[in-house]
């Protein structure tokens, strides 16, 4: 029976992992077993944090909107409620951008939200 030689396949597999581990410290970028564990952990964390990043940014936007809304005499929830009632189609990312870069425009949006809510 013919012998199966796996030298090229095994080398390619190991080189792929070591290439992914480039920049890791110490044996985590030099030795295959340690590098393989660290690469798997890094990929798992990257997958997990791509999802938490979305939650973190939404929280940041809400904090920024709330801070600017309170200078206009509204709470965050009342601002959002007023915008929904006024059919203003601005999402939280846009509102946060306005709050940071253009407070005058945000004040106008807050005025629209105030007028849409009954007192």
Curated annotation (Swiss-Prot):
GO BP term, pick one: ribosomal large subunit assembly
Keyword Ribosomal protein part of the UniProt annotation: yes
One GO MF term attached to the UniProt entry: rRNA binding
Alphabetized CDD domains for the sequence: Ribosomal_L20
GO cellular component annotations of the record: cytosolic large ribosomal subunit
Short name of any one Pfam family annotated for the protein: Ribosomal_L20
Superkingdom of the source species: Bacteria
Gene3D superfamilies in alphabetical order: 6.10.160.10, Ribosomal protein L20
The keyword Repeat is assigned to this record: no
InterPro entries attached to this UniProt entry: Ribosomal_bL20, RIBOSOMAL_L20_CS, Ribosomal_protein_bL20_C
Keywords: Ribonucleoprotein, Ribosomal protein, RNA-binding, rRNA-binding
Chain's role: Binds directly to 23S ribosomal RNA and is necessary for the in vitro assembly process of the 50S ribosomal subunit. It is not involved in the protein synthesizing functions of that subunit.
Entry similarity comment: Belongs to the bacterial ribosomal protein bL20 family.
Name this polypeptide is given: Large ribosomal subunit protein bL20
């Amino acid at each position: 029976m013919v012998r199966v030689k796996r030298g090229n396949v095994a080398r390619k597999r190991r080189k792929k992992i070591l290439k992914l581990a480039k920049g890791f410290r110490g044996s985590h970028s030099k030795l295959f077993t340690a590098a393989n564990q660290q690469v798997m952990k890094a990929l798992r964390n990257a997958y997990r944090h791509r999802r938490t990043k979305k939650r973190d940014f939404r929280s940041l936007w809400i904090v920024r909107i709330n801070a600017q809304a309170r200078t206009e005499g509204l709470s965050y929830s009342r601002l959002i409620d007023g915008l929904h009632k006024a059919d203003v189609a601005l999402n939280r990312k846009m509102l946060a951008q306005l709050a940071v870069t253009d407070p005058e425009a945000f004040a106008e949006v807050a005025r629209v939200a105030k007028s849409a809510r009954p007192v």
